[in-house]
């Protein structure tokens, strides 16, 4: 996706996969940014594993062991049929980690390359496979153009980070071009758990997988979507763009009750 899908001047800084050996001598594939290892492949390749023996579950994996359903559309549909599922909304896995990259140009290149790959992936079975694009919202005008491009190619859903750059929160009018594009195209914008942009105050998550392990991390992730949704709602975005659709992914649903009570009290 990245080596062949990004501009030539970005390839040296793009995510790349290499073989590594851990302290136990086990060889695996890992993602690198430049010469920095950030995560092993196994972090997002646990599909099909059983939980009867948790000791067998680890993040040490090689590409050859990844199920073809992860990257071949026909194989994905075969696996879905085994589970009695007719179709799927295809979303990035490892790609979501890249929202923590500081280099905005690299992130834009990653999103563009992934979106191109995604269009090819879902186009073979457009009724059964629906793709979710990735948008870098650091430059909202650029994000709006990329969203419109993806819609023209058949994509109707896109991820935006659950927390944007700290100096331009979602209440900032700078995002109006993006909201307008989503409103006019009917696109669903989604905010996925743990997709904060780089260096957001109070967020420990980075591109390195080790930053995902603190015990307090998981039970507090709904804070970010609550903050983002509150910013958007009280900035009047939904009134100014009445057809806009914005959703939450993997934050579960229980968090919404208390904010709804607080919204009522606030007005």
Q: Where do the PLM segments sit?
A:
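Helix-coil boundary/capping segments in enzymes
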Residues: 1-267
């Amino acid at each position: 996706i990245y080596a062949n899908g990004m501009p030539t001047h970005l390839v040296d800084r793009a995510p790349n996969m290499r073989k590594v050996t851990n302290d136990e001598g086990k060889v695996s594939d890992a993602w690198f940014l430049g010469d920095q290892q950030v995560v092993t492949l196994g972090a997002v390749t646990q599909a099909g594993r059983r939980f009867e023996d948790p000791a067998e579950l680890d993040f040490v994996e090689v590409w050859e062991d990844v199920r073809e359903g992860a990257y071949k559309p026909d194989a994905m549909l075969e696996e879905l049929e085994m589970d009695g599922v007719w179709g799927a909304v295809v979303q990035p896995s490892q790609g979501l980690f890249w929202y923590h990259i500081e280099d905005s140009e690299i992130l834009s290149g990653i999103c563009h390359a992934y979106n191109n790959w995604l269009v090819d992936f879902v186009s073979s079975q457009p009724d059964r496979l629906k793709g979710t694009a990735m948008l870098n919202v650091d430059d909202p005008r650029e994000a709006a153009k990329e969203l419109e491009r993806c819609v023209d190619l058949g994509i109707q859903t896109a991820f935006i980070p659950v927390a944007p750059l700290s100096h331009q929160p979602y209440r900032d009018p700078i995002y109006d071009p993006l909201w307008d594009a989503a409103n006019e195209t009917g696109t669903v914008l989604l905010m996925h758990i743990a997709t904060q942009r780089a260096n957001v105050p109070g967020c420990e998550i980075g591109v390195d997988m080790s930053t995902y392990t603190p015990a307090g991390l998981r039970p507090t992730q709904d804070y970010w979507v609550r903050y983002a949704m509150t910013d958007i709602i009280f900035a009047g975005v939904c009134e100014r763009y009445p057809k806009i659709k914005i959703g939450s992914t993997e934050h579960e649903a229980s968090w919404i009750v208390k904010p709804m009570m607080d919204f009522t009290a606030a007005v």
